[in-house]
Amino acid sequence: MTIARILAAKGRDVVTTRPDLTLAEVAGVLVAKNIGAVVIADDQGGVIGILSERDIVRAVAKRGTTVFNEAVSMHMTTEVITTSEDEPVHVAMEKMTNGRFRHLPVICQERLVGLVSIGDVVKHRLAECEYEHKAMREYITTA
């Protein structure tokens, strides 16, 4: 199974924001949209960073609540690890597990086309396991 299959099921909508917004403004977006990360994009739609709940907590823990008045660009992760639509799901899962992050932007021809979370990946991996389990049971009972 590939990342494209996950995107086909969940949709391709991605919440993006500009790097000049304040941390408080973007935290408000995370709360309003009930999401754990937002992609920071340039004017052409290219990914220049990602900001997660963890990034916000880390900033507050290091420097206090004054960080909420600072630009997102000061706190976003700029070395963004990405995936492609044709990448196998297990490879994306390994990237997230090994990198200890939960959100993976999907890029096609240098453009953002989706975002998958570890929850999306686990959900689809479980569905795949259930399908395989059912197929094995049917094979055993009909043999």
PLM feature spans:
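A glycine-centered beta-loop-beta connector
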Residues: 30-33, 38-54, 96, 104-119
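Tandem CBS (Bateman) regulatory domains
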Residues: 1-12, 52-81, 88-97, 118-143
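Short, charged helix-to-loop "capping" segments that act as catalytic/coupling loops
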Residues: 2-19, 41-46
